[in-house]
């Protein structure tokens, strides 16, 4: 009985690590969406004290904001923001789990449209 348990422990540890890594990846996607919405919303205001990129970073947790790349742009009647977040790895020696990317588009204020 004890021998079977010892053989099964590494499998349980790998499943636990995979589950935690999947949770971190889902959190990165959520943070990218939050940053994109906040950045687009800020860029859509006619008079704003902050820029969209700063608002996007402020909406994220600090350790994810350090890994983020946020771009904002304005079009006719709309503001668009895209946030890309590098997915961190908890597995030693494995450094790249890709990036999470989310975009958001918000209508601009009437006063700010050309």
Predicted regions and their residues:
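Alpha-helical assembly-interface signal, strongest on the long, hydrophobic N-terminal helix that forms
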Residues: 1-55
């Amino acid at each position: 009985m004890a021998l079977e348990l010892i053989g099964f422990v590494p499998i349980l540890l790998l499943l636990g690590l995979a589950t935690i890594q999947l949770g971190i990846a889902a959190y990165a996607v959520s943070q990218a969406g939050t940053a994109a919405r906040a950045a687009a919303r800020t860029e859509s205001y006619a008079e704003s004290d902050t820029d969209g990129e700063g608002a996007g970073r402020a909406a994220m947790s600090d350790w994810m904001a350090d890994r983020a790349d946020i771009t904002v742009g304005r079009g006719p009647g709309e503001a668009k923001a895209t946030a890309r977040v590098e997915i961190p790895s908890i597995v030693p020696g494995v450094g790249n789990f890709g990036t999470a990317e989310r975009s958001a588009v918000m209508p601009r204020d009437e006063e700010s449209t050309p």
